[in-house]
Regions:
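N-terminal non-globular leader segments, chiefly Sec-dependent signal peptides
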Residues: 1-23
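Conserved short histidine dyad/triad with adjacent acidic residue
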Residues: 14-16, 24-43, 76-77
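Short, surface-exposed secondary-structure edge patches
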Residues: 39, 47, 63-65
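Short, conserved beta-strand element in jelly-roll/cupin
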Residues: 42-57
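Well-ordered beta-strand positions
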Residues: 49, 66, 74, 83-84
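Short acidic-glycine-tyrosine-enriched beta hairpin
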Residues: 61-78
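Ligand-binding loop in jelly-roll beta-barrel domains
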Residues: 77-102
């Protein structure tokens, strides 16, 4: 198990349907974005599940990770630069900053 507040971005690749149901992902809001680059500010830790697309995420500390359809991503609070390579559609959920909320 990982704690993204101490390790940065955490990715669980190709998440199973059982895992998605366990987390209640399909009840989370949906966010869509087209190809391009933008910087997002996160006030709290966010979990995202990519329904479609591909992107590269870069945190302000320089950590970079590629994500794609089927990945569950935990993004720590702070500045994150999104470079979207293929249109992204994702479910997301923000959490208060407490270690227990964010363990994958």
């Amino acid at each position: 198990m990982s704690n993204p507040m101490s390790e940065g971005i955490v990715v669980e690749r190709q998440v199973s349907a059982a895992r998605l149901n366990e987390l209640g992902v399909h009840g989370w809001p949906t966010w869509k974005d087209g190809v391009g680059a933008r910087r997002l500010e996160y006030d709290a830790v966010e979990k995202s599940y990519l329904l479609d697309g591909a992107a590269t995420l870069t945190m302000s500390d320089g950590q970079t990770i590629d994500i794609e359809k089927g990945d569950l991503v935990i993004i720590p609070a702070g500045s994150c630069h999104w470079t979207v390579h293929r249109n992204v559609r994702r479910h997301y959920r923000s959490y208060a900053l407490s270690p227990a909320c964010c363990i994958i």
